[in-house]
A protein has these predicted regions:
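Secretory-pathway/luminal and periplasmic proteins that interact with or process carbohydrate-rich
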Residues: 32-41, 53-57, 73-79, 93, ...
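Flexible, glycine-rich surface segments
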Residues: 78, 85-90, 95-212, 220, ...
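Short, functionally critical alpha-helical segments immediately adjacent to catalytic or ligand/cofactor-binding
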Residues: 19-35, 67-70, 125-127, 296
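Surface-exposed patches in mature extracellular/periplasmic domains of secreted proteins
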Residues: 15, 20-26, 78-83, 109-113, ...
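Acidic, Ser/Thr/Pro/Gly-enriched interdomain connector segments
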Residues: 204-217, 225-270
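Single conserved hydrophobic/aromatic residue that forms the stacking wall/gate
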Residues: 1-7, 12
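Short acidic, glycine/serine/threonine-rich helix-capping segments at coil-helix boundaries
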Residues: 246-251, 259-303
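Acidic, His- and aromatic-enriched active-site or binding-groove loops in soluble protein domains
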Residues: 44-71, 105-110
Length: 304
């Protein structure tokens, strides 16, 4: 991936946008395998079809209009407007409205070419994160040891607190290193993507900025972890416990039961997001069960 080119340009981008180069490169790698992935579809065919047939017709109609405006602006020809099956454009996989708002002509050739230009691609990703609220100088998060005394029900982006409060409660970094002083005095969030059945993290607001690129805890973890590995970090220390006997339909039914009790699970979609996880934990605590904050076969019995 042309390490000397990428490395020098990342230094420039770090200064201009305040987003660490490894985070940008990790997103580039995840979205298009560093520009090597095939992006074969005609963007106009994809977007027009979805504007007519998809569930979110209004959204795709707006994206189709934005795609037409991209050609009108002179960034690309109609023939070269290639997208994914979902209408996402180029190496960073921007939807057309995001392209118009956030794509950057970093190489100075007069076009924002996120299909063929590595400088434009990387700068556009950095600009996207900057405009989404990236806090310069802060990390994305830290894998942590979270003692049982710190409840998994404290998870979520709406329950942030100074990281020093977590430290006082016994939370430590799995690396054995202390939290940097500037991080300890700033806001952090408990993040346990599999409840007590997987690794735990103290996430910073930048973790949730990554989620604005793709609204998935596991996506943001992937990006942060790959960026750390680029800088010499090791594998996650916490293991992921395999949970048998629970299907997505089972999770949806559990969510429905919890909703009927007046708990906010974030929607009964069968996906255990943070609201579902902490609602499960609260139910477990109130009913004398082991507090795992995760949909298990044992919990399924109690909610039937």
């Amino acid at each position: 991936i042309m390490p000397s080119l990428v490395g020098s340009e990342m230094c420039i981008r770090d200064r201009r946008y305040g987003v660490p180069g490894p985070i940008v490169v990790a997103i580039w790698g995840r979205e298009s395998a560093f520009g090597s992935a095939s992006i074969p579809h005609d963007a106009f065919e994809v977007l027009a079809t979805k504007a007519y047939l998809a569930r979110r017709k209004d959204m795709f109609r707006a994206e189709l209009i934005a795609a037409l405006q991209i050609v009108q602006d002179g960034d690309l020809s109609v023939r070269d407007m290639k997208s994914s099956w979902a209408g996402a454009l180029g190496q960073p996989q921007f939807m057309p409205t995001k392209f118009r708002a956030l794509a950057v002509d970093f190489d100075g050739d007069g076009r924002r070419d996120i299909w063929n230009s590595v400088p434009d691609t990387l700068a556009s990703i950095a600009h996207y994160l900057q405009q989404s609220g990236w806090v310069a100088g802060r990390d994305w998060g830290f894998e942590a040891n979270v003692p049982d005394a710190v409840s998994c029900t404290l998870e979520g982006p709406d329950q942030g607190r100074p990281i020093r409060d977590f430290i006082s409660a016994g939370v430590t970094r799995v690396s054995g290193r202390p939290f940097p002083p500037h991080e300890a005095s700033a806001t952090g969030h408990l993040m346990m993507p599999a409840g007590r059945m997987g690794p735990a993290f103290i996430a910073t607001p930048n973790f949730y900025v990554i989620k604005q690129y793709n609204n998935s805890d596991l996506y943001a973890l992937f990006i942060g972890h790959v960026a750390d590995r680029m800088q010499g970090g090791g594998a996650f220390r916490g293991g992921w416990v395999k949970v048998d006997g629970v299907s997505r339909g089972d999770v949806a039914r559990m969510q429905q039961r919890l909703q009927a009790m007046g708990r906010d699970v974030g929607g009964a979609d069968g996906l255990p997001g943070f609201k579902t996880r902490r609602s499960i934990g609260a139910f477990e605590a109130e009913n004398g069960l082991r507090v795992d904050c995760w949909p298990t076969a044992e919990l399924k019995k109690h909610l039937n």
